[in-house]
C-alpha cells in the first residue's frame, strides 16, 4: 500500500531534466528543486548532446536548458529535444537576458526563458506553467 502511494505521488510530480555544463550550479539547482514536492529531478546533463540523449531516455516533462554548453549548445539541443521528445517543454535557463538570445530560444521551440538570477520562485512557477500544472 505504501509503495503504491509513493509511486502515485511520484507520478504526479513534474519530471525535470537539468542541462547545464556548470556542475556546481546544476547540483545546487537540483537541491533547490528537490525541496519542492511537486517536482522530481530525473537527471542532469553537462552538455547539449547528453541532454538530448537523457531526454529521449527519461522522457521529462520539462528540460531546464543552459544556452552556452560544449559539444552541442542549448539552442541546438532544444531543437533536437522538441523533435525527438515533442511532449517535453524546454525552459532556457541562462545568464543572458539579451533579446537576441530570447528570440533564438523561442525560435528553437523553448516554452520559457528564465535568467539565472531569477532562480527561486520564478523558476518553480515557470516549470509548473510549462508542464500545465
Where are these regions (language model features)?
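C-terminal output helix
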Residues: 100, 118-131
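Active-site beta3 strand of CheY-like receiver
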Residues: 58-64
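Receiver (REC) domain active-site loop signature in two-component systems and cognate sites
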Residues: 69
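Acidic catalytic/metal-coordinating carboxylates
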Residues: 47-50, 72-76
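Short, conserved "switch-loop" micro-motifs in signal-transduction and mechanochemical regulators
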Residues: 96-97
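Short amphipathic alpha-helix used as the core "switch/output" element in two-component signaling
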Residues: 53, 75-87
Amino acid at each position: 500500500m505504501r509503495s503504491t502511494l509513493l509511486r502515485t505521488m511520484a507520478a504526479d510530480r513534474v519530471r525535470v531534466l537539468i542541462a547545464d555544463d556548470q556542475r556546481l550550479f546544476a547540483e545546487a539547482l537540483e537541491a533547490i528543486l528537490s525541496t519542492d514536492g511537486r517536482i522530481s529531478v530525473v537527471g542532469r546533463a553537462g552538455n547539449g548532446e547528453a541532454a538530448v540523449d537523457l531526454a529521449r531516455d527519461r522522457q521529462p516533462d520539462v528540460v531546464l536548458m543552459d544556452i552556452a554548453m560544449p559539444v552541442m549548445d542549448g539552442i541546438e539541443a532544444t531543437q533536437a529535444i522538441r523533435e525527438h521528445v515533442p511532449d517535453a517543454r524546454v525552459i532556457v535557463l541562462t545568464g543572458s537576458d539579451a533579446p537576441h538570445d530570447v528570440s533564438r530560444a523561442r525560435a528553437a521551440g523553448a516554452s520559457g526563458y528564465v535568467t539565472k538570477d531569477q532562480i527561486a520562485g520564478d523558476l518553480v512557477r515557470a516549470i509548473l506553467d510549462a508542464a500545465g500544472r
